[in-house]
Regions:
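Terminal amphipathic alpha-helical/low-complexity segments used for targeting or macromolecular assembly
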Residues: 1-16
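Phosphate/pyrophosphate-binding betaalpha-module
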Residues: 49
Length: 122
């Protein structure tokens, strides 16, 4: 597991979180309490912040990356599940969403509370 600072900003990962091996988290990343991050997840907060709420599950092989410019962060609410291999880029997921396996959520997209995004959706 690699939890690394980037440009003076260090990830915040509470002790209540479960972070598996082969996970890379770097930059301005803040995880809420009781999150689970499964193997081969990459969180890259190089340009803006990534903020993840409590009780969120990020499954195997996901990429979470910020966009350049104002408003390009990634905000993930509480109780969210992000399925295997999904890509989240500069977007907002509100509370209790389910993002299907392999889905891609692009810059500026907002997924409202309790929404389901189908596997493979773009």
């Amino acid at each position: 597991m690699a939890i690394l600072p980037y440009q003076g900003k260090t990830p915040t990962v509470p002790e209540s979180c479960t972070i598996f091996e082969q996970v890379s988290i770097y930059g301005d990343v803040t995880l809420g309490e009781n999150c689970v991050v499964l193997p081969q997840v990459v969180m890259r907060a190089e340009h803006n912040a990534i903020v993840i709420g409590n009780d969120t599950n990020i499954q195997d092989g996901c990429l979470i990356h910020t966009e350049i410019g104002e408003g390009g962060g990634v905000n993930i609410g509480s109780g969210v599940t992000v399925g295997h291999g999904a890509i989240l880029h500069g977007c907002t997921l509100k509370d209790r969403c389910m993002i299907g396996m392999g889905a891609v959520i692009q810059d500026g997209a907002v997924v409202e509370e309790e929404c389901l995004i189908a596997a493979g959706a773009v």
